[in-house]
Amino acid sequence: MSDRMRLIPFEKMLSWVLSELKEKDSIFGIHRSKFYKNKSGSYTELFGEKLATPLGPAAGPNSQLAQNIVAAYLTGCRFIELKTVQKLDGEDLPVSKPCIYAQDECYNVEWSTELRVPDAYNEYIKAWFMLHVLMKELGLSEKRDFMFNMSVGYDLEGIKSPKMDAYIEGMRNAANTDIWKECREVLLSNINQFTHFTREDLDMISPVVCPSITLSTLHGCPPQEIERIANYFLKEKKLHTFVKMNPTLLGEKFVRDTLDAMGYGYITLNGHHFIHDLQFPDAVAMLKRLKALARELNLEIGVKLTNTLPVKILNQELPGEEMYMSGRSLYALSISLASKLAKEFNGDLH
């Protein structure tokens, strides 16, 4: 298996999708019988838009490539949090391989996108078009029932850099970007290959790809920096904002006891993260201030639960001294933090 991500041109991907659908009644190996269609008539509302399901793929390497986003959509995902991008990218951010270990609970040692920011952007726009096409062509929905959420990190200086600013602005409105024009042209030139997707449907695709953004910060990021970045997204970029929170907010004793109770006594925590990461009272105070600001701006603030949990590498599972835990062992911590925050805000927090 290659250790590099290979990008598929939009026209080639479209040809692949249409030919596989015709020949095998499947797309990327997913049979038509498995394609999800909301038959209940119930929807989740977020930012004034409707989602057929409140589910989405975990934001990781899987949500870097357009074809994986398509696969997630076909199987029922409708809230697509795109893989985090940052100023330091591509070959400038070397990743030790293997970088993911998932025998039971999951671990990784990779940081952000392995693609250059412009390449990641192109993948997300290709996916945006492809989902609109399949939504109509397959009869999965008459109107858009999915949403993209961009994710960026990891400090305000990097986020304000020209590269990152171009990315954010391009997600806010993609109409004048090269990849947007390319995808439109490809679909126009192939419009006669569709049975249900029309030129009118193409013209209806909104260039506002992401009305919301998720802030990802490194473990140990000062609370003042987190709040400065969130303020920037709300005030300057006019974006609904999610702040990614760490499971360390629960405190070391709770995390240790919970992992032990689930049979994960062999997981060794790094105690210093519980000291230097954002503390729960500070998080609550910050979120209350951000909610007040968002309300003034007619925007919304929320949290993403949770970031990974740093643990020690003791058995050479992956290269290095520390790895980041996710998977089912993290789920109980995420749900516990969600419950704690929900009680603190009386349920009034996305």
Predicted regions and their residues:
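Short, well-ordered coil/turn segments that N-cap beta-strands
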Residues: 51-55, 76-78, 237-241, 297-301, ...
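Conserved beta-strand positions in the central sheet of alpha/beta enzyme cores
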Residues: 81, 242-244, 304
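Contiguous hydrophobic segments
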Residues: 123-144, 241, 253-257, 305, ...
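Extended, H/D-rich, highly charged conserved domains that either
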Residues: 221-238, 242-255, 274-281
